[in-house]
């Protein structure tokens, strides 16, 4: 007989904590490997001990050939030698969603209606050919209505009815031409298809360009010109223009006393003279501010400053009087009056003997 030896299996003990951890690590490795991640530049600060900041410049994590997925400590970069945790982890970007289908563009707006076209008239012969039918139709209607009108009017009105009927026939014949032209006109051609960018002129614009509206436009131009001359002034402006500024009026005695006070003060107000000015203003009967303004306005009139210069400028701008005409001056040294007197004396002495040149 064979002896059956009981074999007991010992669980594998791992240094990082039991057999369950290995199984859990295997189960977790699958989703980690399924979700791939990209590791970019290295962010390790090599100057942290010095209180600064310096990186090695590695741009992307490169796994080392000796790296083992089961040993996390072996996951170092082959370029900079730093662990993978120092590199910036960039998860794989999710796939871009499908492009959304844009809605179809809206249909173009319908073209505007075409402008009204003038009606086409048939020749006169066609209108005359259709007119008798309308005349017969109108006379038949009047014959149907005639018995009732005869009973109302009596037998004495037949002649008037016949005359009125003749007039109606003539009117019907005149109107029938117009009706025939409208009814016998051929079918209108379908309106042309216009492009979306074409904008026909409005009816009122077409009418305004006609010759019939020219007088109306010309008549409206004077009113437009009168309106363009300028808007009427607002009512407030008229009242402000009519309102006059209040001016203080002084008596001759007040003017003399204020002139005397101004000359006493030297036509200048100073702080030391405030008491004198207040007392004199009360005696004169004017306020201190009014006296100050009067003195400022009349200072140049009495001192001969600005007013004197103004009068001198006005005198210089006045035209000069023309120089006097000297009638007594002569080139030969004798006056004009003396020469005239000598000539008169010579003429008188000669008498009828004639002039000295004649002898």
UniProtKB/Swiss-Prot annotation:
Stored InterPro entries: Homeodomain-like_sf, Homeodomain_ZF_HD, ZF_HD_homeobox_Cys/His_dimer
Gene3D superfamilies linked to this entry: Homeodomain-like
Any GO CC annotation of this UniProt entry: nucleus
Biased composition regions of type Pro residues, renumbered to the chain: 92-118
GO molecular function, a single term: zinc ion binding
Pfam family of the protein (one): ZF-HD_dimer
First-listed, main subcellular location of the protein, grouped into a coarse class: nucleus
Official protein name in the record: Zinc-finger homeodomain protein 10
């Amino acid at each position: 007989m064979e002896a059956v030896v009981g074999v007991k299996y010992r669980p594998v003990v791992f240094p990082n904590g039991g057999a369950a951890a290995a199984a859990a690590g295997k189960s977790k490795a699958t989703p980690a490997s399924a979700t791939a991640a990209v590791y970019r530049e290295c962010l390790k600060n090599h100057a942290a001990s010095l209180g600064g900041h310096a990186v090695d410049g590695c741009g992307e994590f490169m796994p080392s050939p000796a790296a083992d997925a089961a040993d996390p400590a072996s996951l170092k970069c082959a370029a900079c030698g730093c662990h993978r945790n120092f590199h910036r982890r960039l998860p794989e970007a999710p796939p871009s969603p499908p492009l959304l289908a844009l809605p179809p563009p809206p249909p173009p707006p319908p073209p505007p209606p075409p402008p009204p076209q003038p009606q086409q008239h048939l020749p006169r012969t066609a209108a005359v050919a259709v007119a008798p039918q309308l005349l017969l139709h109108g006379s038949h209607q009047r014959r149907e209505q005639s018995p009732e009108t005869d009973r109302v009017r009596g037998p004495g009105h037949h002649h008037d009815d016949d005359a009125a009927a003749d007039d109606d026939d003539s009117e019907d014949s005149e109107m029938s031409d117009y009706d025939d032209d409208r009814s016998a006109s051929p079918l209108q051609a379908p309106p042309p298809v216009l492009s979306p960018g074409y904008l026909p002129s409005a009816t009122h614009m077409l009418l305004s360009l006609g010759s019939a509206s020219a007088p109306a436009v010309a008549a409206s131009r004077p009113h437009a010109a009168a309106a363009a001359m300028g808007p009427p002034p607002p009512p407030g402006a008229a009242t402000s223009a009519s309102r006059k500024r209040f001016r203080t009026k002084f008596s001759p005695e007040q003017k003399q006393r204020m002139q005397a006070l101004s000359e006493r003060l030297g036509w200048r107000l100073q702080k030391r003279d405030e008491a004198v000015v207040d007392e004199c203003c009360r005696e004169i009967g004017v306020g201190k501010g009014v006296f100050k303004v009067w003195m400022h306005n009349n200072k140049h009139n009495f001192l001969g400053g600005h007013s004197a210069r103004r009068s001198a400028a006005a005198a210089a701008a006045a035209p000069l009087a023309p120089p006097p005409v000297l009638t007594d001056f002569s080139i030969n040294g004798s006056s004009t009056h003396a020469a005239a007197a000598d000539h008169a004396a010579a003429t008188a002495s000669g008498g009828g003997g004639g002039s000295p040149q004649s002898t």
